[in-house]
Each structure stands twice: as structure tokens, then as C-alpha cells.
Amino acid sequence: MIIELAKNYGFCFGVKRAIKKAEQIKDAATIGPLIHNNEEISRLQKNFNVKTLENIQALSNEKKAIIRTHGITKQDLEELRKKDIEIFDATCPFVTKPQQICEQMSKEGYEVVIFGDENHPEVKGVKSYVSTKAYVVLDKKELQNIKLPNKIAVVSQTTKKPEHFMEIVNFLILKTKEVRVFNTICDATFKNQDAIKELSLKSDVMVVVGGKNSANTKQLFLIAKTNCEDSYLIETEEELKKEWFLDKKHCGISAGASTPDWIIQKVIAKIENFRIN
């Protein structure tokens, strides 16, 4: 059986930057998980004493706080700055961009449509920078019964599929007089999604490695599953089952943006140890 890695996979720029920052700072607390990968979070806690707090209210005697890659709300940032604590911002620049856009567009009188999951920390943070009105949607149908203003700005959660974002944009263009469209989908998302699409079309089994609470990993899995029925989403090599690979000829592997290479290599090694001819 051939084992092939996607052309683009794993750690993105923002995650690499955050991990490096956490390793250098040490002995700190993150507000929410730094990234959506439980194994890497555990490694940072064990080796660098970087612990994860649920929210700002959980801070007690910590001297250093790291803002997660997904960012935090504007209100939480203001609250954090009032505390006697050193702040290190690990928000991904691709996430900071829609925050800034929302703030500026609001000042110019635009209401904002955010394409994304309203429960995702990134989207909560982005929405908090809107001072007019924000509409968080996952489908154009959610906009059909809303009385839209004449001026709308549109941004996307960084990990969404571009074609779905365009469905929202095309709907709005027909419904309102002025639409400002900002492509806030991350470059790494484009590349990883294109790569897994290509690989899954020629594979008869696919393994996607990453946190099951990771939005970008779940998107990769959905793309793989669309093209390859026998697709599996795992967090560690312990979840692999030999029967997945029996009678298979081509195994494709991809990984979410928060998945470190050391986990991916363990997955590959275990599949190789199954010795599937």
C-alpha cells in the first residue's frame, strides 16, 4: 500500500508563531487553548509550564498571559490590560485582519456579515469589533428573512471554504446597494484544502490528523469524505485500526493547521507497522 502525504498540511504560520512564542515565554497561562490540539497543549504544559485557563476570570497569581491564536474579544482584551500581568499576543495575523476590518467598516457606517460559526472563539473575537450590527451566518438562507441595510461589509472565518463564502457574497450583491467584500480566508486554508481534494480523489483510504474541535481540521475531513468514502479523522495514532487499510492500495494523509509533525510521524509509523501489502 502506498502512503502519501498531502502537498500541503499541518502547522500553519500562525500556529508555528504561537508555539514558538509559548516555548520562549514559559511559565505562562493562555486564555483558552492556545491552539486546537490537545496533544500539543499537553506537551506545552509538561515541558514549558504553559497552562490553559478557561477565561480571564480564572486568572489568579499568574504573571504572564498569552492570547490564543484565535484571539479574544475586544472587551476581554480591555479587561486583561487592567490586570497586573504581562501580556503576550499570539493572535494569528490572519485573525487580526478581520478584527481590524470590522472595526474600520463599523466606523464608516457599514453593518457586517460574518461568514462563520458564531460559537467559535475566532468569530466571537471578530464580532466584538463590530460597533454597528453584526450578522453571523453559516448559510445564505439565514439572511433571507433579515432586512438588510444599504451598506454591508462581508468577512469570513479564516478556515472556511472559499466557494461557500462566495455563495454568501453573491446573495448579498443581489439584495443590497453596496457590498464591501474582504477575503479573510487564510492562504494556508486554501492550500491545505486544495491539496487534500487532489489527494483524496486518488486515494481509497484517507486519514486526517488533528483536533476534533479544530474547525480547519473538520473542513479537511469533510473534503476528504466527499471524495473518498473511507476517510477517518483522528487525533493520535492510538485511534488507528488495521482493518481500515485492508485491501487498500493508496492511503492519503493530511493534517490540520494545529497538528505538529511529531504526531503526524507517529501516525505514519503505525500505519507502516500494519504491513499492508
Curated annotation (Swiss-Prot):
Active site feature: 122 (proton donor)
Binding positions for (2E)-4-hydroxy-3-methylbut-2-enyl diphosphate per the UniProt entry: 36, 70, 120, 158, 214, 216, 258
Top EC category: oxidoreductase
Positions annotated to bind isopentenyl diphosphate: 36, 70, 120, 214, 216, 258
Enzyme Commission number(s) from the entry: 1.17.7.4
Any one Pfam family match given in the protein's UniProt record, by short name: LYTB
Keyword Oxidoreductase annotated: yes
Comment on bound cofactor: Binds 1 [4Fe-4S] cluster per subunit.
Pathway: Isoprenoid biosynthesis; dimethylallyl diphosphate biosynthesis; dimethylallyl diphosphate from (2E)-4-hydroxy-3-methylbutenyl diphosphate: step 1/1; Isoprenoid biosynthesis; isopentenyl diphosphate biosynthesis via DXP pathway; isopentenyl diphosphate from 1-deoxy-D-xylulose 5-phosphate: step 6/6
Binding site for dimethylallyl diphosphate: 36, 70, 120, 214, 216, 258
Keywords per UniProt: 4Fe-4S, Iron, Iron-sulfur, Isoprene biosynthesis, Metal-binding, Oxidoreductase
Function: Catalyzes the conversion of 1-hydroxy-2-methyl-2-(E)-butenyl 4-diphosphate (HMBPP) into a mixture of isopentenyl diphosphate (IPP) and dimethylallyl diphosphate (DMAPP). Acts in the terminal step of the DOXP/MEP pathway for isoprenoid precursor biosynthesis.
Family: Belongs to the IspH family.
Protein name: 4-hydroxy-3-methylbut-2-enyl diphosphate reductase
Organism: Campylobacter jejuni subsp. jejuni serotype O:2 (strain ATCC 700819 / NCTC 11168)
Gene label: ispH
